[in-house]
Regions:
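Hydrophobic faces of well-ordered beta-strands that scaffold small-molecule active sites
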Residues: 7, 191-199, 216-218, 246-248, ...
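Short, small-residue alpha-helix embedded
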Residues: 15-16, 76-100
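Charged C-terminal helix
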Residues: 102-188
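Catalytic cores of alpha/beta
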Residues: 246-261, 290-302, 335-337, 342, ...
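Conserved phosphate/ATP/ADP-binding segment of small-molecule kinases
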Residues: 1-66, 234-304
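Catalytic domains of carbohydrate-active enzymes, especially glycoside hydrolases
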Residues: 207-219
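Short, well-structured alpha-helical segments that form the helix of a local strand-helix-strand
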Residues: 28-36, 99-115, 380
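Glycine-rich phosphate-binding active-site loops on the catalytic face of alpha/beta enzymes
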Residues: 220, 267-275, 307-320, 352, ...
Length: 389
């Protein structure tokens, strides 16, 4: 076990490997911990045999965190070969340099897409021959790269120690926010966003809004709490009677207090922010993502937009992921399935044309404007090159 990176048993195989009964969520976690105690670096348990679950919930556990991947149960037919197929798909996605979280998300989606493609046809054939689907075993067929948004699982993230059972899962703030009756955040006023400047002071807001820019983000990095509050207040006042949609980075409580249009949060921020308070205040919400797993984490929230990055290497901030590239960006846009998208990270004049061709609604830029010799000319050149003019 200690020679492999990940073990992928189903429920029955987990029970056999650990010599423990697995009959509910508590015993499932106990068995996973037993297997990790035997040397497994990480464990991914497929939930298809977990009779106690409402949905099919696969679980991934490693030293630092736990992820759950949930899909609706498929009632018709018994599809054989999906476990081997998932493990093979997982290995293939890892070889293609996807991080483990994204590789698992894609492997789960791949099997789901195979199931949704295979079973209806084979069940129809069985019905035509008056064969009961409950008594029939079908065999999985290979498929291409998963592309249908409905094939992808809901992904939930948990730190170690916060994964024990269904009740514990309900305490997850993101699940609470996405299960709210009014789960949609307010829509953007303009979805054809164009160039999206991300700036660090109200002075930049004042310089740029006369260009007719449709969206900007104020990301204040330094200053006292009072100075930050004043900058946010002034920025909101500056654009209040314009068409510019101003998002405040991180400071969601000040954004609510001062009546901002919207707030932008990173992955770490959504763990601690009161998302229902943001929604109740009528603020729009943009969220940063860095791959398939994080997109699937936030899609259920129906945010006002999803930021996709970082596309190219960037020195603007330390990033938790590798550059994604334009090919992956195009897949991310398709996965967001109607939720407005913003590309971000290392985008400049020479790269912006290829980024725009992916179909993103907006393209966020930082140094391409703020470090330009003539920022307003740089903004206009970016608009022109991207085809947003």
């Amino acid at each position: 076990l200690n020679t492999v990176d990940i073990v992928t048993p189903n429920i029955d195989e987990l029970a056999w490997l650990t010599h423990l009964p697995v009959v509910d969520e508590a015993s499932l976690l106990t068995a996973i911990n037993r297997l990790r105690g035997k040397g497994a670096k990480s464990v991914y348990v497929k939930g298809g045999h977990a009779h106690w679950q409402k949905n099919v919930s696969d679980i991934f556990v490693c030293a630092s965190h736990t992820l759950r991947f949930s899909q609706p149960k498929y009632a018709n037919g018994n599809l054989r070969g999906t476990g081997c197929m998932l493990a093979s798909a997982l290995a293939a996605f890892i070889v293609h340099d996807y991080c483990i979280e994204d590789a698992l998300t894609l492997a789960n989606a791949y099997v789901s897409e195979v199931r949704n493609h295979t079973l209806p046809k084979q069940c129809a054939a069985a019905n035509a021959n008056a064969i009961s689907n409950e008594l029939t075993t079908y065999f999985a067929q290979t498929n291409g790269f998963p592309a249908k948004p409905e094939s992808f699982p809901l992904v939930t993230f948990h730190q170690r120690g916060a994964t024990a059972n269904e009740k514990e899962r309900d305490k997850d703030s993101l699940l609470k926010a996405s299960s709210c009756k009014e789960s949609h955040f307010p829509a953007l006023t303009h979805t054809h966003l164009g160039i999206y400047p991300v700036v660090d002071s109200v002075q930049w807001i004042a310089r740029l809004w006369p260009t007719g820019v449709k969206i900007m983000q104020l990301r204040v990095k330094q200053g006292s709490q009072e100075d930050i509050r004043q900058q946010i207040k002034e920025a909101i006042e500056l654009v209040k009677h314009t068409d510019c949609q101003l998002f405040i980075n991180d400071y969601w409580e000040l954004a609510i207090e001062l009546g901002a249009y919207g707030v932008h949060l990173g992955q770490e921020d959504i763990d601690t922010a009161d998302l229902n308070a943001i929604r109740s205040a009528g603020l729009r919400l943009g969220i940063s993502t860095h791959g398939f797993a994080e997109i699937q984490r936030v899609r259920a929230l129906n945010p006002s937009y999803i930021a996709l990055g970082h596309i190219f290497p960037t020195n603007t901030k330390d990033m938790p992921s590798k550059p994604q590239g334009v090919a992956r960006l195009k897949k991310y846009v398709q996965l967001c399935d109607g939720i407005p998208t913003v590309a971000i990270g290392g985008i400049n004049l020479s790269r912006i044309g290829d980024v725009a061709k992916t179909g993103v609604n907006g393209i966020a830029v930082v140094s391409a404007i703020t470090q330009a010799a003539h920022p307003l000319k740089a903004y206009k050149a970016l608009v022109q090159e991207a085809g947003f003019a």
